[in-house]
Design a protein with these regions (language model features):
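Acyl-donor (CoA/ACP) binding surface of acyl/acetyltransferases
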Residues: 1-39, 54, 58, 67-172
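Donor nucleotide-sugar recognition loop
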Residues: 41-44
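Active-site rim helix/loop that mediates acceptor-substrate recognition in acyltransferases
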Residues: 46-64
Length: 172
């Protein structure tokens, strides 16, 4: 049996921690039930959102890395999911982010993505980090560019559509 540890990381305003069903799932299910998820695979009902959360946690077991629940330290509120992602069939190892609607516009995705990228380089030894962004997701494209990433290529995913693959050129 694989055992794994999800590291807890703190940055200025945020706490990276493992996803906790009791604390996080209601907000996660609301997020996945919203129109906001059109760039993250589409809306899910509550039971499908639970399975998506289980897959997210399983990624840590299979790959040894994954996504963290992001908590605002000042309030204890769940802000979203940010982390490292590379499921079967995905075009590249990537930094991904999804911030719940009420926490957007505060720089949380940027702050978290900077630290997740640093973790990929320093703790995991990645040579390159990407972000795979569905065409049309202007907010995520803007964040990738703010992070210093450049458009490297596009990739047609069989179920998701056209991904724009941004390469993060800034190292640790």
């Amino acid at each position: 049996m694989n055992t794994f540890n999800i590291p807890t990381i703190e940055v200025k305003r945020l706490l990276f921690r493992k996803f906790c069903e009791e604390r996080d799932f209601d907000a996660y299910a609301v997020f996945y039930g919203s129109e906001q998820t059109r760039y993250y695979g589409g809306q899910l009902d509550r039971s499908s959102a639970w399975r998506a959360a289980a897959a997210m946690m399983g990624h840590w077991v299979i790959r040894g890395y994954g996504a963290w629940a992001i908590e605002e330290k000042a309030t204890g509120d769940f802000c979203g999911i940010v982390g490292l992602w590379y499921p079967e069939g995905w075009p590249e190892q990537e930094i991904s982010w999804s911030i719940v609607a009420e926490k957007q516009g505060r720089g949380f995705a940027y702050e978290a993505a900077v630290r997740a990228r640093q973790y990929a380089y320093e703790a995991l030894g990645w040579d390159v980090v990407h972000s795979c962004i569905l065409e049309g997701n202007s907010a995520s494209k803007g964040l990738a560019q703010k992070l210093g990433a450049v458009l490297e290529r596009s990739d047609d995913h069989p179920t998701r559509g056209k991904f724009l693959i941004y390469r993060h050129i800034e190292g640790p």
